Amino acid sequence: MSYLGRQLNVPASRKELTAAVALSAGNAVLIKSDGKATKPGATLGSEVVVAAVGSSYNVAIFDSSNNKTLVAYQDAGDSDKGKCAVVSVSGTTCTVGSVVEFEAGNISYLEGTFDSNSNKVVLTYRDNGNSSYGTAIVGTISGDSVSFGTPTVFESATTVFTSATFDSSNNKVVIAYADNGNSNYGTAIVGTVSGTGISFGSASVFESANTNSPSATFDSSNNKVVISYRDNGNSSYGTSIVGTVSSTSISFGSATVFESAEVAFVSSTFDTTNNKVVVCYADAGNSNIGTAIVGTVSSTSISFGTAAVFSGSEQGYYSNAAFNPDTGTVGVAYQGGSDVQKFAEGTVSGTGISFGSATTINSSGSYIDLVYDTSADVFVFHVRDAGNSSRPTVLAFDLGTALTSENFIGFAEEDATANGLATIQLGGSVNDKQTSLTAGQTYFVQTDGTIGTTAASPSVTAGTAVSATEILVKG
């Protein structure tokens, strides 16, 4: 009589693979297109505190030349100075370098962008220690640290609501802001990075009215800068305008309303898969629900499709958007109901966008920014964690690999760390790291990585239980 368990007359089949994310013994394992082992479903990494201080204006910028994320913030524990740190990601684990001061004075309205021509990070902010002038500074990341050049004033007047993007066709940084020295008119200026410094051309007004919450993004298919904002001179409607950079100046077409209601917390990104601009905002005409809309640039104008909700029936405050080139989707981070910080993923189709269910990122906070790390293949969040004294905090989110009818290969034999070696028990092996199975029962892989007796969609057989803790992997 033979024993149907670990004494099977079948050679054990195992394979060592690099783990794309941390795996636990007994996890169902999928194979990625790059040959790494992963598990179905999303993985949210642990929170890592950047510094034990209160923070505001939390910003994240991805440096694609170094595969690092720079997180910057206003340090409430040190006279509101400008501070930052470099974040490295492995799997969904964030490692934070030493904190660096980039501005010794009080700062606010902090934003930034990455200049892929000079491989520099550019931070923009209001320097409250220097008459609240609009200021920019260039940072160079090396290893786990960053160094800065000398700050440069781009507007010798009080500025508010700055935003920055990089025009890769002209190798220029474009900063959009409200110029308090000129009735808060919407204004833009072109910057050129050289070495560790930045110089500017003449400013151009894009909206001759009080402007709030401008967000600049670059349309790389049309080589245009798109600025979206709240036009306080037109009932606070959501509005966008297309800019064309020439040398050190920028000119604009006519403005287009994308939301005929009051908006707030405007953010935007560019979808390089579909060549569309995606604008996100809180729709005050609809209970401040988080909303997104798709824009199509043609020459110097932009047209919009139908808006879609990303926050369900909740508010969508402090929204920021980033594009994921690996999946061709748009990620939106925002503050939802009860100040819970959340993430939603949107897919553009034609001139519309649809969103799946939101994921909770942090239980309480306001400022939240995100970037997509194209090396680690994860979103990196920089949050103001209100549940932990408003400390600047980072964490990574792997959207995971979707289960298909072909990519399930077996089970993890033991625990494995991200980017470490994982031993995978393949077809014909018996994995003994399961619990509460029924011997003789067929089990199916679920889309969240668990196994169950009912097939998911797609239907993927995991194997047959041979005891309460063992499963014979389907060959």
Kindly label every feature range from the protein language model.
Residues M1-T69, Y73-G77, K83-T93, F102-K120, ...:
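Extracellular receptor-binding modules and their adjoining Ser/Thr/Gly/Asp/Asn-rich linkers
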Residues G45-A51, G97-F102, G149-F154, G201-F206, ...:
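A short beta-strand motif characteristic of beta-propeller blades
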